[in-house]
Amino acid sequence: GIFRAYEAEVVQSPIDADGVIPQALEETFTRLEREGRKVKFFYTIPNYHNPAGVCISEERRPQIVEICKRHHVLIVEDNPYGLLGFDGRTYTSFKSLAPDHVLYLGSVSKIFAPGYRVGWACAPSAMCEKLKLASESAILCPTSMGQYSISMYLSEFDWRNQISTFRGMYRSRRDAMIQALNDYLPMCQWNVPEGGFYTWVKLPQGLDAKDMLPRAVTNLVAYVSGTAFYANGEGRDHMRLSYCYPNEQDIREGVRRISEVVNRDLELVSLFG
């Protein structure tokens, strides 16, 4: 993705239902240090993760901060979905736990309007000047109209109530997604996200989401193969489904179309292995 575009070497660390696993993160840092590979930063989406939909538990957050401090690794906390918990819950930010050790990123594209490519960064003071220079070289200048529109919206409208409206809408669409998965893809496994945009679906053994995608597109439905979210080529047995844009009826129809492709591929696997 974006990191590879800048020729970064990306190394992944495992997660589970409670997010990043502290012990595994420590082991990853230690292994890389032993190999003489300097870790530049630790990037994470701690809340309603894309694509897994999980949140790092409150218990793990201070542990992760201490591990990163101990190994002198900056935390890049990307939090575009943090206000989209369906029950209104918010989590302790890494930034609040270690202000001088965290670069915090936010965006209006997920909570107001995706067409406004406006975001913000809260950086340690020592990084601010370098961050401004990097931003100027990468994007020259964000759209003035977009920034002005968002500024007016935040100052003159009830944006908190609008986010609450979005939460209710996304919860309903999440429910439609889960019901459709139960009805059409009972042979698969999935999480039930408590916020954000995505459901992470595991396919039955023998199926390949990346290989299956062209057949899904032919059936007028699409998803993102799990391989897009791994640094090492894994994830062929997973697909990311998004419920943020389509309405409940379209979500159900989309899952039904995916199920047709899955069932056809399962038949081929049973016949030919």
Regions found by a protein language model. Give the residues of each.
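PLP-dependent class I/II
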Residues: 1-273
